Swiss-Prot record:
Keywords: Ribonucleoprotein, Ribosomal protein, RNA-binding, rRNA-binding, tRNA-binding. The lineage of its organism: Bacteria, Pseudomonadati, Pseudomonadota, Gammaproteobacteria, Legionellales. One of its GO terms (molecular function) is tRNA binding. With S4 and S5 plays an important role in translational accuracy. Interacts with and stabilizes bases of the 16S rRNA that are involved in tRNA selection in the A site and with the mRNA backbone. Located at the interface of the 30S and 50S subunits, it traverses the body of the 30S subunit contacting proteins on the other side and probably holding the rRNA structure together. The combined cluster of proteins S8, S12 and S17 appears to hold together the shoulder and platform of the 30S subunit. GO terms for cellular component: ribosome; small ribosomal subunit. Part of the 30S ribosomal subunit. Contacts proteins S8 and S17. May interact with IF1 in the 30S initiation complex. Gene3D superfamilies: Nucleic acid-binding proteins. Residues 1-25, 103-124 are annotated as: Disordered. This is Small ribosomal subunit protein uS12. SUPFAM superfamilies: Nucleic acid-binding proteins. The gene is rpsL. It comes from Coxiella burnetii (strain RSA 493 / Nine Mile phase I).
Length: 124
């Protein structure tokens, strides 16, 4: 245990928190190019074909990003915007692709939660 005088001279240092999204390097989003678009299966007990893309970000990092929503228009060489946020049942997927920006189309026909899927308000 440190004495009071030692703590006055040299205070305790808080441990630096490890980033959940290191490839973004502190940025809220990053642009990247799809190198591979494919489906993968989640871990137990879930079962599906989850749409993911391998993306090379502008800083040179290569990450796996999830494509949310029903249907997408992404293919190899599509330019996408990446944000943080992991997918719990897909190991190694720590990023999401932002729908409705750059080459990524929004989810057409989406009525609820449209802002998360890049869809404009429908005309009445």
């Amino acid at each position: 245990m440190a004495r009071i005088n030692q703590l006055v001279r040299k205070p305790r240092r808080a441990r630096a928190k490890k980033s959940d999204v290191p490839a973004l390097e502190g940025c809220p989003q990053r642009r990247g190019v799809c190198t591979r678009v494919y489906t993968t299966t989640p871990k137990k007990p879930n079962s599906a074909l989850r749409k993911v893309a391998r993306v090379r970000i502008t800083n040179g990092a290569e990450v796996t990003a999830y494509i949310g929503g029903e249907g997408h228009n992404l293919q190899e060489h599509s330019v996408v915007l990446i944000r943080g946020g992991r997918v719990k049942d897909l190991p190694g997927v720590r990023y999401h692709i932002v729908r409705g920006s750059l080459d990524t189309a929004g989810v057409s026909g989406r009525r609820r939660g449209r802002s998360k899927y890049g869809e404009k308000k429908p005309k009445e």
